Design a protein with these regions (language model features):
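STAS-like cytosolic regulatory interaction modules
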Residues: 1-60, 67-111
Length: 111
């Protein structure tokens, strides 16, 4: 199932991801997260990325998630990733990027 994205802005900026995040489904156009990066969002705002409705996930999904986190850091957003499936968490753990799922731009972490 191809991924789809829903963006909510109240009470906080929230990206709900649904579908599979794997080599078969992740495309370059998904880097824009359903138009999220075109929105005018103030630095310091919080972004929640909810992965509770994704199916399969592999390293392509992890790469996409890390891209989104890097984009959020560039815009100085505080990010939180919710409902990370164990398959994705395991890949993040062995890649030593699991701590990127909760980020604070003031912490000095380079994404």
């Amino acid at each position: 199932m191809l991924p789809s994205f829903q963006i909510a802005t109240a009470p906080q900026l929230r990206l709900q991801v649904e579908g599979d995040l794997c080599f078969d489904t992740v495309r370059a156009e998904h880097c824009d997260a359903g138009g999220l990066w075109a929105r005018d969002v103030a630095p310091g705002s919080q972004l929640c990325i909810d992965l509770g409705k994704i199916g399969r996930a592999d390293s392509a999904g992890l790469a996409l998630l890390l891209h989104w986190l890097a984009r959020a850091a560039q815009r100085k957003l505080t990010t939180r990733v919710e409902s990370v499936p164990e398959s994705l968490r395991g890949l993040a753990r062995i890649s030593e990027v699991e701590d990127w799922f909760d980020s604070d731009p003031s912490a000095g972490r380079r994404v």
